[in-house]
């Protein structure tokens, strides 16, 4: 799980670049939709290693249940 954090942060930082591009406008030659498309593509590509590790480590099949609260007739669990 420790390896997922830097890859996820890289993905999120690359997704914030179009927001900052509207403030500074560094690319006057390229249109904004092309810049956003390229940034989202790079963010998707950088998120693939962590997604692959997540799937290969069988974490998506982990089931957990949290017993939250019990009253007289109601049993609340979060699953």
Swiss-Prot record:
GO cellular component terms, semicolon-separated: mitochondrial inner membrane
One record GO biological process: mitochondrial electron transport, NADH to ubiquinone
Membrane topology note: Multi-pass membrane protein
Membrane-traversing stretches: 5-27, 40-57
EC number: 7.1.1.2
Main location class: mitochondrion
Domain of life: Eukaryota
Subcellular location: Mitochondrion inner membrane
Top EC group: translocase
Alphabetical keyword list: Electron transport, Membrane, Mitochondrion, Mitochondrion inner membrane, NAD, Respiratory chain, Translocase, Transmembrane, Transmembrane helix, Transport, Ubiquinone
Reaction equations catalysed: a ubiquinone + NADH + 5 H(+)(in) = a ubiquinol + NAD(+) + 4 H(+)(out)
GO molecular function: NADH dehydrogenase (ubiquinone) activity
Family in the record: Belongs to the complex I subunit 5 family.
Self-association and partners: Core subunit of respiratory chain NADH dehydrogenase (Complex I) which is composed of 45 different subunits.
Protein function: Core subunit of the mitochondrial membrane respiratory chain NADH dehydrogenase (Complex I) which catalyzes electron transfer from NADH through the respiratory chain, using ubiquinone as an electron acceptor. Essential for the catalytic activity and assembly of complex I.
Protein name (Swiss-Prot/TrEMBL): NADH-ubiquinone oxidoreductase chain 5
Organism, scientific name: Macaca fascicularis (Crab-eating macaque)
């Amino acid at each position: 799980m420790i390896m997922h954090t830097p890859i996820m942060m890289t993905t999120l930082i690359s997704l914030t670049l179009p927001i900052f591009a509207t403030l500074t406008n560094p690319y006057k030659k390229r249109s904004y939709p092309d810049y956003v498309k390229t940034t989202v593509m790079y963010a998707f590509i950088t998120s693939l290693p962590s997604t692959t590790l997540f799937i290969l480590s069988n974490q998506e099949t982990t089931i957990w249940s949290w017993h939250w609260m019990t009253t007289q007739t109601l049993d609340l669990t979060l699953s």
